[in-house]
Amino acid sequence: MHEKADGEELQERLRLIRLLHQTNPYPHGPGTASQRRNRRRRQRRRWLRLVALADKLYTFPDPPTDSPLDRAIQDLQRLTIHELPDPPTDLPESNSNQGLAET
């Protein structure tokens, strides 16, 4: 029941944000350059107030903390293969190798 109330409250908040957004159109119309500039400046301030109000009305939940699986995947993604040195071309001969070859 509590989840349903939260969902309805969220929908109401989103409806309010949408209504506020629709009632704040971008300014159009004739006028001098300073009049158009002032209209744009006032509209920008209204937009910033709308965004601030929307942030107060609807705050996003904190992202989930990384699970052990996510951390393991990130560790695997950070692995790199380092270049190995070339193997030696001439091997030293030892007595144990010669004995095996003769028998």
Swiss-Prot record:
Residues 21-43, 78-103 are annotated as: Disordered. It comes from the Viruses. Residues 16-24 are annotated as: Homomultimerization. Signal peptide: none annotated. A motif (Nuclear export signal and binding to XPO1) lies at residues 71-82. Residues 92-103 have a biased composition (Polar residues). The keyword Secreted does not apply. GO terms for cellular component: host cell cytoplasm; host cell nucleolus. Its main location: host cell. It is found in: Host nucleus, Host nucleolus; Host cytoplasm. GO terms for biological process: mRNA transport. InterPro entries: REV_protein (IPR000625). The keyword Transport applies. A motif (Nuclear localization signal and RNA-binding (RRE)) lies at residues 35-49. Keywords: AIDS, Host cytoplasm, Host nucleus, mRNA transport, RNA-binding, Transport. One of its GO terms (molecular function) is RNA binding. The RNA-binding motif binds to the RRE, a stem-and-loop structure present in incompletely spliced viral pre-mRNAs. This region also contains the NLS which mediates nuclear localization. These overlapping functions prevent Rev bound to RRE from undesirable return to the nucleus. When Rev binds the RRE, the NLS becomes masked while the NES remains accessible. Homomultimer; when bound to the RRE. Multimeric assembly is essential for activity. Escorts unspliced or incompletely spliced viral pre-mRNAs (late transcripts) out of the nucleus of infected cells. These pre-mRNAs carry a recognition sequence called Rev responsive element (RRE) located in the env gene, that is not present in fully spliced viral mRNAs (early transcripts). This function is essential since most viral proteins are translated from unspliced or partially spliced pre-mRNAs which cannot exit the nucleus by the pathway used by fully processed cellular mRNAs. This is Protein Rev. It comes from Human immunodeficiency virus type 2 subtype A (isolate Ghana-1).
